[in-house]
A protein has these predicted regions:
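Bacterial Sec-dependent N-terminal signal peptides
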Residues: 1-21
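Carbohydrate-active catalytic/glycan-binding domains of CAZyme proteins
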Residues: 17-312
């Protein structure tokens, strides 16, 4: 980052780098309600988020029995295109996928049956996507409950999810589905970031209901596809949190999340990924924002997106 401004917050003091208008722009993909389509918000500082296009739907879902678009995750791929995956249903065994060169013109939507091989699988929730430099492939991962697969925790929640994944290079051919993470409890909403070479951090939700957890934790690995170590203590407070997504500004990591019982968004921050400070009162999002993903675009891409005529 070439130019920075410093914003100071007291009790405790937090210093963040704010990008000027000539640099990249932060975007946040999200859904509203039960998942009517893709919405986008933008920010220049990572704190104040405004709805793009008057909070209009950018893309409507067309795949899956329920035609939902929940938990939209967008990344810029190694090919320069934007790749998006999302939850299509509460109870189907597949996920949605589409790509775009500019967030305006989208490919035909695909239904990817990632858990079709498991006859008892209940769902495929909150998929995320990462590019793996080691495998030279995209890794797509999500949460699924398979009744009886982990009987020791079957009675501790409404479902009993674990994190699974597939890999692909072309979004036409996919690897066999494999288990990505088994932390010893009901887990959903995993998202992974590369910290440095050969070090990855997974943010995840402990979905345990008995006793109630409903918090976010982290686990580390030397590889994107694991194995990941034992999860740490909660990084969120005495509220229910889910749907983490992560942005690094300068040396500060910011984790945004859905405080879904309070119908608002929250955030925590850290410089060392070990000690976390709640800054929920420092961030603002469009009303009704739900679980999504933060990513960056160039100012030129953003200007083109703002000026476009969106036809969902």
């Amino acid at each position: 980052m070439r130019k920075i401004l410093f914003v100071f917050f007291m009790l405790p003091v937090l210093v963040f780098a704010q990008k000027e208008s000539g640099d990249e722009v932060y975007l946040f993909s999200y859904f509203k309600g039960n998942g009517d389509g893709l919405h986008l918000a933008y920010s220049y500082d990572g704190f104040n988020w405004k709805a793009l296009k008057n909070d209009s739907i950018i893309l409507k879902p067309t795949v899956g029995n329920d035609k939902l678009m929940r938990d939209p995750c967008i990344i810029r791929g190694a090919d320069g295109r934007f790749h998006m995956v999302w939850t299509v249903s509460w109870s189907e065994k597949g996920i949605g996928y589409a790509s775009s060169p500019d967030l305006i013109h989208w490919s035909e939507q695909q239904y990817v049956p990632v858990m079709a091989q498991e006859s008892a699988a209940r769902n495929a929730w909150a998929p995320e996507i990462n590019w793996d430099d080691q495998l030279q492939a995209y890794i797509i991962y999500w949460a699924t409950t398979i009744p009886g697969r982990f009987p020791e925790t079957d009675s501790l929640g409404d479902n009993n999810h674990r994190i699974y994944y597939v890999s692909t290079r072309d979004f036409k051919h996919f690897s066999d589905t494999k288990l990505l993470y088994e932390p010893g409890f009901n887990v959903i909403d995993a998202t992974i970031k590369k910290v440095k070479k050969d070090k990855y951090i997974m943010f995840l939700k402990d979905e345990t209901r008995k006793p109630v957890q409903k918090n976010l934790r982290v686990a580390f690995s030397d590889s994107l596809t694991g194995p990941y170590g034992k999860p740490g203590k909660p990084i969120t407070g005495k509220y229910w949190a889910e749907g983490p997504t992560v942005l690094k500004i300068g040396d500060k990591w910011i984790v945004y999340f859905d405080k879904y019982t309070e119908h608002t968004m929250g955030a925590v921050t850290s410089t060392d990924l070990a000690n976390w400070t709640d800054i929920s009162d420092k961030v603002s999002f469009p009303e009704g924002t739900r679980h999504g993903t933060v990513f960056t675009v160039t100012k030129q891409e953003f200007d083109k997106l703002q000026q476009s005529a969106i036809v969902p």
